[in-house]
A protein has these predicted regions:
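Surface-exposed extracellular loop regions of Gram-negative outer-membrane beta-barrel proteins
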Residues: 235-250, 366, 469-511, 523-524, ...
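Structural signature of Gram-negative outer-membrane beta-barrels, strongest in the C-terminal barrel
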Residues: 220, 334, 353-365, 412-533, ...
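Outer-membrane beta-barrel translocator/receptor signature
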Residues: 122-125, 136-213, 221-225, 274, ...
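Membrane-embedded beta-barrel scaffold of Gram-negative outer-membrane proteins
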Residues: 279-283, 289-295, 299-307, 471, ...
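C-terminal beta-signal and adjacent terminal beta-strands/loops
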Residues: 630-636, 654-701
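Acidic/polar loop-and-plug regions of large Gram-negative outer-membrane beta-barrel proteins
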Residues: 197-201, 214-283, 298-334, 381-412, ...
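Gram-negative outer-membrane beta-barrel transporters
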Residues: 433-434, 530-532, 551-639, 673, ...
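Acidic, small-polar-rich N-terminal luminal/periplasmic segments of exported/outer-membrane proteins
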Residues: 23-158, 512
């Protein structure tokens, strides 16, 4: 479903294009004059410049304007504006009923934030979401969809901006960024930015510090070419982390204060990532466009935290009040390289117009994991046991990881190499003014190696999709698609100690929908779908030898519908509404599945989700006010505990004075106590943020 939300961003999956710098700026200005949140195209669905209304697949684009209006610092702040997506844990989401963490950056695989840090938005121009099958184009594609982060690139027009932010919980942030030409002709352009923030967390003992540095250069090459080079450095230090949830009863009510933390103040999660990107686009002929891209990143994450292992009734009063704990010292080192090459050839065969895409990509990830575990009853270390923590009256600091003689503990390690590679062919056919057909085929290969034990798992398969769009009348388009999917299991899930190896995941989806633009003021998009996925690996919640156990569900079926509405109610008033209904259920647990899971709902998949964001401009005082609401229906956790429905509200005020812009945002306006998602019983539910207040001032020069 294609809800255009962008500030007229360029068509390609990256901000750069083969157009001249002057043309780039013209496109942006024209889009801002038309509407605040609408995009007309985004190549993430086809890797071509096909208009969104002609793509037989659901696509949503969240632009920078919407990110700024909502004072969104990380991607979790944007879920209300994307139908069918909700929070699962950390960077993971539920998309069309399924948990998924696979993301793209500028159309290439690899997440520098790994699995336990949440992607930040400082250097992100827009967020693109493909709903439904993406494997036939990107490989390794989850059937629910894929998220693509488009990073900011150099512009031809000089812009400089300084911003300061403050808020409750001692939140402080500042950034400086600039972009523009480096020479008189504008053939060399730059962008540089630096962002830093810090705050005391909403959970006891928790705090955070982040620093992001980003620099890029763009060079005109010949008459049609553009080369972009980019480097990003990310540092994130989280105190009192890794965070788990807060224990609940089976009805989903928190058993204690939502601020409760199982970690000590000395616990931490420190992450450092570096990313390098090179993109080159050119047009050797009028009907042929070529783009090449390569991306490298490294990620180092060190976690030292107390894992909650379950409540016991220590004082025998009939109430389980003591959370037993385990100390985990974990180090993850990831290094990855991704590359892709694409060519788009426009030809005619008789009266039929073809837009033929052919390309290939490759991805390699080296993942090293080293860990120690200290248990409560483990006295061989010659040090005190790992103390638990009281649920109702926690006393922090009675012991820390310094007291556990970790030097006496053995290390366990894994080292894997995951390779993904594929080639694809796609044809978009215009069979006249009203009828368009899209057909795509992709071959995928993979190889996962145990670099310590020497074992390996490899395989290959074909994925395909077929879709069609029919224009009923100007501004009203009907579409349908069917697609198959093939996703290799991650290298870590092949570990025999965790229950592996497992066969590759397979999927198939059927989708129909409507895309419409009414009176040039109202965009209404609807979709209905059914997705069958088999052999989905999930955590069972069981720990054997310090290793989290996995199991494969035989078949899960997700059915649902989505509605996206973007309306320019007046010249001053914009309304963005998203609604999704989903029913994801386990149909067959399979021979090695979770016991008695057949027929149960899939974890953290709400049946109903509604998001609203509206903005009203007050031109007489150069201001705008915004109001948002986010409703997520009842869900179940991984262990079947209820996760209650919730509704939260936000407000914002933005005003400009000369070159200054001032903004205030209130999130969770009525301080609703709620669970954002559920996990396993001993970990509890992840509490949603309490009311937060942010103010900021920005100066452009």
């Amino acid at each position: 479903m294609a809800l255009p939300l962008s500030l007229a961003t360029p068509a390609l999956a990256s901000e750069a294009s083969a157009d001249t710098p002057k043309d780039l700026d013209k496109v942006e200005v024209r889009g801002r004059a038309q509407t605040l949140y609408r995009a007309n195209d985004a190549a993430v669905g086809t890797r071509t410049d096909t208009p969104l209304e002609l793509v037989p697949q659901s696509i949503q684009v969240v632009p920078r304007e919407l990110i700024d209006d909502q004072a969104a610092r990380q991607v979790t702040d944007l879920y209300r504006s994307i139908s069918g997506i909700s929070f699962f844990s950390y960077a993971g989401v539920t998309l069309r009923g399924f948990r998924q963490e696979n993301v793209l950056y500028d159309g290439l695989r690899g997440d520098p934030y790994a699995g336990f840090s949440v992607p930040q938005l400082f250097n992100i121009e827009r967020v693109e979401v493909l709903k439904g099958p993406a494997g036939a184009l990107y490989g390794g594609g989850d059937a629910g969809g894929v998220i693509n982060y488009v990073t900011r690139k150099p512009k031809a027009r000089a812009e400089r901006r300084i911003e300061l932010q403050a808020g409750d919980k001692d939140f402080r942030a500042g950034s400086i960024e600039g972009t523009g030409p480096l020479n008189a002709s504008g053939s060399i352009r730059y962008r540089a930015g630096l962002y830093a923030d810090s705050e005391q967390g909403v959970r006891w003992n928790a705090d955070s510090e982040s620093v992001i540095g980003d620099a890029s250069l763009a060079f005109d090459v010949g008459q049609t070419g553009e080369l972009v080079l980019q480097f990003t450095d990310i540092t994130q230090n989280l105190g009192g982390n890794r965070l788990r949830g807060v224990p609940v009863n089976d009805a989903g009510s928190f058993l204690t204060d939502r601020r409760w933390n199982h970690n000590e103040a000395s616990d931490f999660l420190d992450m450092r990532a570096k990313v390098a990107l090179a993109q080159y686009r050119f047009a050797p002929r009028d009907n042929l466009d070529v783009d090449l891209a390569a991306r490298w990143f490294s990620n180092n994450e060190h976690q030292m935290y107390h894992e909650p292992m379950g409540l016991i009734d220590r004082d025998r009063d009939g109430v389980a009040e003591w959370m037993t704990r385990q100390l985990r010292n974990q180090i993850r080192d990831n290094t990855a390289f991704a590359a892709s090459g694409n060519a788009v050839w426009r030809i005619n065969t008789g009266r039929i117009e073809h837009k033929v895409l052919f390309g290939a990509d490759v991805y390699q990830l080296d993942a090293d994991f080293t860990a120690q575990t200290a248990n409560s009853a483990d006295l061989a270390r010659g040090a005190g046991p790992v103390r638990g923590i009281d649920l109702f009256n926690p006393v922090y600091g009675a012991s820390t990881w310094h007291d556990y003689n970790l030097a006496a503990l053995p290390w366990r390690s894994t080292a894997t190499r995951s390779k993904r590679y594929g080639g694809y062919l796609q044809d978009e056919l215009a069979l006249g003014a009203r009828w368009h057909v899209l057909a795509g085929l992709r071959w995928d290969g993979f190889k996962d190696q145990d670099r310590m034990g020497g074992g390996s798992v490899d395989g290959n398969d074909l994925s395909w999709r077929l879709g069609s769009t029919f224009t009923v009348r100007d501004g009203v388009n009907l579409y349908a698609n069917i697609a198959s999917g093939f996703v290799p299991q991650s290298a870590t899930s092949q570990n025999p100690a965790a229950g592996g190896p497992f066969d590759a995941e397979r999927s198939r989806q059927w989708e129909v929908g409507l895309k419409s633009l009414l009176a040039d003021r109202v965009t209404l998009n609807m979709a209905a779908y059914r997705i069958d996925r088999s052999n989905i690996v999930q955590a069972t919640g069981e720990v054997i030898g310090g290793v989290n156990q996995l199991a494969a569900l035989g078949l899960v079926r997700s059915t649902g519908m989505e509605l996206d509405l973007l309306a320019d109610v007046t010249e001053r008033w914009v309304v963005n509404l998203t609604y999704a209904y989903n029913d994801a259920r386990v149909k067959d647990a399979g021979p090695n599945g979770i016991t008695n899971a057949s027929g149960d709902r899939f974890a953290n998949a709400p049946r109903n989700k509604l998001g609203v964001w509206t903005r009203y401009d007050l031109p007489s005082i150069n201001s705008a006010i915004g109001f948002g609401a986010d409703h997520v229906g009842e869900r179940v956790s991984l262990d079947g505990q209820t996760v209650k429905a919730y509704t939260v509200f936000d407000m914002s005020w933005k005003t400009t004075w000369k070159q200054w812009q001032f903004q205030a945002n209130v999130k969770n306006l009525f301080d609703k106590v709620y669970a954002a998602s559920g996990f396993i019983e001993r970990n509890g539910h992840f509490p949603g943020e309490p009311r937060r207040v942010y103010v900021q001032a920005a100066y452009r020069f």
